[in-house]
Amino acid sequence: MAVLTMKQLLEAGVHFGHRTQRWNPKMKEYIFGARKGIYIIDLQKTSKLLDEAYNFVRDKAAEGGTILFVGTKKQAQQVIKQEAERCGAFYVNHRWLGGLLTNFETIRKRIDKLIELEEMEANGEFDHLPKKEQSRLRRILEKLRKNLGGLKNMTSLPDVIYIVDPRKERNAVYEANLLKIPTVAIVDTNCDPDEIDYIIPGNDDAIRAIQLITSKIADAYLEGREGVSFGSEEAEENNQKEDNEEIFEIEDVDESEEM
């Protein structure tokens, strides 16, 4: 049983890596070849490693563990928010605040401030304040919502962190590794796979690829929490035998959008 079929991975453009001038040699074993100056990721390995990541997240959730979704690049922001909210996970989709994990007690105080200001706004307390003070508090509230809105219910450190583009989210990766919090991540051809516990080799720039993989991580978390199977789709019989040369025949994805 495979979480995703080869066809789904191909159609989402998961196989498109970065240009050959931009790569990390540690990703060599996950690269099938190159096409028109673009690295092509080996989707057989992506499929296998995605299955492992799915099972890990599902099992952690079944044990009562929590997960934090992280993706602050433009292509990931909306997907991270939607999928995290769908499965009841925490998320950061705008800016990773330094010390979010390593100095969580201080961050938690800022989250409490966010909750306090939201309650004041909901109760109409802002309306009784001078306009200048109203404006100041609303600015603070907006900033806190943007940076910490996805963490309001996070009262302790998460048990797993899911990351889109660990190269961009290097601070999140550093803090997670320092605290020995397991990480799951979409790892493109320019990333260092050694920094991540459960890697998913794939395109971390295309919205469709990010959506496809992130939705499966969310499904895994839901399955573990609620005990409801989302049905790992059985790969087509020829998925195992499928020749990766088919990758080179896919023409319906605009590579310029993926890089």
UniProtKB/Swiss-Prot annotation:
Q: Where is the composition biased (Acidic residues)?
A: 233-259
Please give the biological process terms from Gene Ontology that the record holds: translation
Recall the GO molecular function terms of this protein's record: structural constituent of ribosome
SUPFAM superfamilies reported in the protein's UniProt record? Ribosomal protein S2
Q: Which residues form a coiled coil?
A: none
Query: What are the boundaries of the region Disordered?
Result: 228-259
> Which top-rank group of organisms is this from?
Bacteria
Keywords tagged on the record: Ribonucleoprotein, Ribosomal protein
**Record's GO cellular component terms:** cytosolic small ribosomal subunit
- Name one matching Pfam family: Ribosomal_S2
Looking up InterPro entries in the UniProt record yields:
Ribosomal_uS2 (IPR001865), Ribosomal_uS2_bac/mit/plastid (IPR005706), Ribosomal_uS2_CS (IPR018130), Ribosomal_uS2_flav_dom_sf (IPR023591)
Q: Does the keyword Disulfide bond apply?
A: no
**Family recorded in the similarity comment:** Belongs to the universal ribosomal protein uS2 family.
| Designated name of the protein | Small ribosomal subunit protein uS2
* Organism for this UniProt entry: Thermosipho africanus (strain TCF52B)
